[in-house]
Amino acid sequence: ALISQAEEESLYFKLIEQVNKDFALANEPLDAPTSIFPFEFKNLVQEKIYKLIHYKFAEYLNLLYIIDVPEEQIKKLDGSDLVELSEQVAFLVLQREWQKVWFRNKY
């Protein structure tokens, strides 16, 4: 729903650019092409987050800090299943990045 709203408001490309920018700032480039389909984009973000949680936890925390995902939202998640956790974190990351893009466009 979040990505379809971005598409409706013609901000999908800006969302991809923002995500790419913040992942690059965290020294964990995502390099998602602006031509990527929304479903693939969500999966790419989720896969990258899964790998960070599993293999590079410090970099994962740095990424959350750079993107400014609220810590209390992360603490509410159940970390027992890494695949599910990465899916939930990917949603929070995309949600926060969408807020940035939307506010920048509106104001």
Tell where the protein language model's regions lie, with residue ranges:
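Conserved phosphate/pyrophosphate-binding and hydrolysis machinery centered on Walker-type P-loop NTPases
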Residues: Q5, E9, D31-F39, G79-V83
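Amphipathic alpha-helical binding modules
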Residues: K76-Y107
